[in-house]
Each structure stands twice: as C-alpha cells, then as structure tokens.
Amino acid sequence: MGFQIAIDGPAASGKSTIAKLLAEKLGFDHLNTGATYRAVAVYLHEKGLSSSSAEEEIENVLKDLKIDYVNGRVYINGEDYTEKIQSPEAGVLASNFARLEVVRRHLVRIQREICDDKNIVVEGRDIGTVVLPNAHLKIFLTASLEARVERKLKEYQKRGLKVTKEEVERELISRDEQDSKRNVAPLKPAEDAVIIDTTSMSVEEVLDRILKLVRERMNT
C-alpha cells in the first residue's frame, strides 16, 4: 500500500491548487475526484439522463463505463472530457448526480482502483470519510464564502467565462447545501482530519503546513 493523502473541502476552498502542488512536491500521483464526477455527470446528461432518471437507466450506462485520469485530464471510454467539465453548469450537474447512491457506488469503486498501491494525493468531498477512510493523512480545507467566491470568480474569468460575482455566490451556496445535506456521503470532515482554514493563508503557507504534516506522518 502506498502513502495516501486525502484532501477534502467545499468548492473553491483551495483543494485543487494545493493537491496538485503537493503531489508535484512529493513526486506523488494526483487524483481530482471532482473531475471524475463532473465528467460522468456531463456524460449522463449527454445520454439524455438526469438525476431524476430511473436508477436502472443510470446503472445500465455506468456499468461498462471506463474512466481514466492522466496528467490532470479525465477520459471517459477513451474520450477526453477535460474541456467539457469546466463550465459552472458541469458543476451543478455533478452536485445533482452525486446525490445518487448508484453514481457514488460506481465512482468510489473506480476511484479506489485508481488509488490502489500508489503514493497519491486525492482531492474531493468524501475522500477521508468514504473513498480512503484509511488514508495516512486527512486534510479538510475550508474558507469563508467571500474568499471562495473571489477565488471561483477569478478562476472562471481566467478561462474566459462571463459570470457575475452574484452568480458565483449563488452557485457556491447551492453546491454547499447539496453537498452537505445529501443522504449519501455528505460533505463533512473525517473525525481524524486536520482542518485548515485557508481564508487568510497564501498557497505557500497552506502547502508548507501540509508538507510538515506529511513528513511527521511518514516518520512515525
């Protein structure tokens, strides 16, 4: 078994930035589980399905699904979905489908297969509680809504997407509510997670703190 690091937290808390940099620093693999959920959600949507579709219909589509995550790009049945999952709509679709037990069951199995026997940094919303409950280090990142809105807005603007601050705030509030209140694997810190509030911390400060924790765990 490799050394597994779980990083959880709400949208725009800094998970992706930190997880990617941490993996690079350590020479570990990196998995963004949110990207796998968005890709599957977009794929199901393209197949004409919604979160209110019959479970059997969704099961039939998912049972033979193949997901690959390579160098930050996500592939479904060999097709690159990376660009398709960048829109706010993809995030909303992902939150809707992620509430379904049938979707989470398939994705958790696939995510565990990707992580098996690897030194890996895995980011998401239920990594420390569901996907990798025995991870060597569990981190839960959080930040104020205001800070997260600013980060998400900059991210969208960098991609050339025209969205207002109000739209981003509504999106995050909606996603927070869905993520924390869903019946299956709600967003919450694992009991043994280290909680880090990134509101007033720089990326370097967060990274340094986690690297220190990694070194401590590796030496015990």
From Swiss-Prot:
This is Cytidylate kinase. Belongs to the cytidylate kinase family. Type 1 subfamily. It comes from the Bacteria. The lineage of its organism: Bacteria, Thermotogati, Thermotogota, Thermotogae, Thermotogales. PANTHER family: CYTIDYLATE KINASE (PTHR21299:SF2), CYTIDYLATE KINASE/PANTOATE-BETA-ALANINE LIGASE (PTHR21299). ATP binds at residues 9-17. CDD domains: CMPK. InterPro entries: Cytidylate_kin (IPR003136), Cytidylate_kinase_dom (IPR011994), P-loop_NTPase (IPR027417). Disulfide bonds: none annotated. Keywords: ATP-binding, Cytoplasm, Kinase, Nucleotide-binding, Transferase.
